[in-house]
UniProtKB/Swiss-Prot annotation:
Protein name, UniProt field: Secreted RxLR effector protein 123
Function summary: Secreted effector that dos not suppress the host cell death induced by cell death-inducing proteins.
Motif position, RxLR-dEER: 49-70
Highest taxon in the source lineage: Eukaryota
Compositionally biased tracts (Polar residues): 87-96
Keywords linked to the UniProt accession: Host cytoplasm, Host nucleus, Secreted, Signal, Virulence
Localization, UniProt: Secreted; Host nucleus; Host cytoplasm
The keyword Signal appears for this protein: yes
Residue span of region Disordered: 57-96
Disulphide bond pairs: none
Length: 96
């Protein structure tokens, strides 16, 4: 019974290899790419087009070479220091 099982497996393997060998290689080369290569070309074109520095002098966004994204040129200009007066902090603290 075990021998019949091994013979059946051997026949399935042999039949599968003949089927794989019968595939025409020309048909594999002619398969459509579903636009994948066109999408890669479009992605490269968009990346090179939109990561340029703006010619508009009012635009304060510059190209950051570290991460290749448009970022504000100086984030420290928009940050201001918030100073909390001492009486407010003492009123907030609870004493137990």
């Amino acid at each position: 019974m075990v021998g019949a099982y091994y013979v059946g497996i051997a026949l399935l393997v042999a039949g599968g290899s003949q089927t794989a060998a019968g595939v025409d290689q020309y048909d594999l080369e002619q398969t459509p790419d579903n636009g994948f290569s066109r999408l890669l070309a479009l992605d490269e074109m968009l990346r090179s087009r939109f990561l340029r520095k703006s010619r508009n002098p009012k635009d304060n966004l510059m190209l950051s070479e570290a991460n290749e994204e448009r970022t504000p040129s100086s984030p420290s200009n928009s940050l201001t220091e918030f100073i909390v007066s001492e009486p407010i902090t003492t009123n907030v603290m609870r004493t137990e």
